């Protein structure tokens, strides 16, 4: 096996972890290095690895809690979901997803999502990632001064604000009711303390207190800054890939997925698992999607 090593994927986002048997005992120093890379780069990529459901839970819960292995106590390590254009119960089965933070509209965006490639055909759509801590660090001073003290409203429902050139490709979730939250645009990360540029093109609707035209123009400026091509990485999926990311500091998007196109079945597990299950049970509203074409 390759010697344990962590390498940066790009200067701004992502690290690849190599030479680690995830199903075995992971040494304390390896956990420490992974947690450090996770906090610094926001995304961990593992290629060509065997990962069962309990192991995936162990990894995401431990990283989410900064290396605290005791947080696994009481977790139902059998639970998982799919993002898939093949599995009958697969979420987001087709279409394009704009850059977003999972559950940005809720009181529970502080999550650690993970996806594992169960079955991936060549040509399956990649997932793209961007680091909004970096976005804030390099935001011009005049824009920092302009947005400090401002808040934005984020909501569930239709993707975006109808301002893309590919509206027909966007998958639109069907919610029973709308959900929303208001947060500062310059937002502190709850674990690392880093400042994030905390708006996303999928779910941020407006900047509070600004006229619509001014709000839209400022959001467009911020999005153009966040999603610069040189700040983005693309992960091209293969079977047995595992990707774990920080849901608040890292935004992710997805290229167009065909319902009848290359199979793309990814096993999805988020931390903190128990708290999220409790929150969604009380919310009693899970989005549905039209069925994808059979593969």
Model-derived features: positions:
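Non-heme Fe(II) oxygenase catalytic core, chiefly the N-lobe of the double-stranded beta-helix
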Residues: 2-242, 248-295
């Amino acid at each position: 096996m390759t010697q344990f090593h962590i390498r940066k994927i790009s200067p701004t986002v992502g690290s690849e972890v190599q030479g680690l048997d995830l199903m075995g005992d992971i040494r304390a120093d390896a956990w420490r290095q992974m947690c450090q890379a996770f906090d610094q780069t926001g995304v961990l990529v593992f290629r060509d690895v065997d990962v069962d459901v309990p192991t995936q839970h162990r990894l995401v819960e431990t990283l989410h809690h900064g290396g605290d292995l005791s947080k696994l106590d009481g977790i139902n390590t059998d639970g998982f979901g799919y993002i898939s254009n093949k599995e009958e119960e697969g979420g987001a089965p087709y279409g394009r997803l704009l850059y977003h933070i999972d559950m940005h509209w809720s009181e529970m965006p502080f999550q650690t999502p993970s996806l594992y490639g169960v079955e991936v055909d060549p040509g399956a759509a990649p997932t793209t990632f961007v680091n909004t801590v970096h976005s804030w660090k390099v935001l011009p001073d005049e824009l920092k001064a302009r947005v400090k003290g401002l808040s934005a409203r984020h909501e569930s429902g239709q993707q975006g604000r109808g301002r893309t050139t590919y509206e027909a490709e966007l998958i639109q979730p069907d919610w029973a009711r709308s959900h929303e939250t208001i947060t500062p645009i310059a937002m502190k990360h709850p674990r690392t303390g880093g400042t994030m540029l905390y708006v996303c093109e999928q779910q941020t609707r407006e900047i509070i207190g600004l006229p619509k035209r001014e709000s839209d123009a400022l959001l467009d400026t911020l999005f153009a800054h966040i999603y610069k091509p040189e700040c983005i990485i693309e992960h091209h999926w293969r079977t047995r890939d595992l990707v774990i990311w920080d849901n608040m500091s890292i935004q992710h998007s997805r290229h167009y997925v065909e319902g009848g196109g290359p199979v793309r079945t990814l096993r999805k597990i988020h931390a903190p698992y128990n708290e999220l299950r409790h929150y969604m049970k009380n919310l009693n509203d899970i989005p549905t999607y039209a069925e994808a074409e059979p593969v």
